[in-house]
Amino acid sequence: MRSEPTQTQAAPRYDLGLVLEGGAIRGIYTAGVLDVLMAHGLQADMVIGTSAGCIHGCNFVSGQAGRSIRYYRKYRRNRHFMGLYALLTTGEAVGRKFCYEEIPTRLDPFDEAAFEASPVDFYVTVTNVRTGRAEHILCPDLRQGGGMEVLRAGASMPLCSRITMIGGQPYLDGGVADSVPYRAAKALGCRRCLVVLTQPAGYLKHPSASQPMFAAAYRRYPAFVETMARRAETYNAQVCEVEQAAKSGETFLIRPSRDTGITRMERDMQTIDAQYALGRADTEAAWPALALWLKATG
């Protein structure tokens, strides 16, 4: 049995880590990738993700292939899941009680026992609103009041989510400060990284038109506002670094082979299914090269 979530201080050594970008509903691509990796029996030592990357990555740790797309198909159109109704009635675009309590404990149970028994370490990226910096928290469990609070904080999108307090510190979506936690994985001692991005090649993030709203909403947290203002620049640099690492053979990269037109808050299940199917297809296509890379770098 593992203990309560703790913020990472030491740097343990890992042979292979999965680095998972977020992207809200767009991240269902990652679920498709992970389901194929599980079908091929891929073994990793750690998973580190941001936002939706963690939402789907936890199912890799618990060994629950197919769970993400299953509950998306069942509940995405439920007004308590995500959207305007949830925002107006709870103050958050993602229904906290429905998504983080009812689904994992009752409607489509998360296998907590398998997660805790797994040898795979699971890190959630969060942004400290006070410092504006990313923190990568090791979650030994995803229990209510424990690791589940960290998971929720890491996927709490600014402007449409409440700040989550953990250990007296305020947190929001990890994507604000560290959308692609590749460097964090290396700093944690990960020798080889398999990185999953959710945007196709050539995508460049541009400064948000909502920056004035961020500045007004979080005026008490100037460091957070500054980090948000630099987000596009930071993201583009991170992707460039991962691309260079993939070219050198140090890292293996899987990303969408095309743009399905999916949005962050997508409701159309055909589009969501297409994004998931693309993740599966891209990973099946990449598997021969990935298997060779794993053997060559092992």
Q: Where on the chain are the PLM-derived regions?
A:
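Patatin-like phospholipase
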Residues: M1-T50, C58-G298
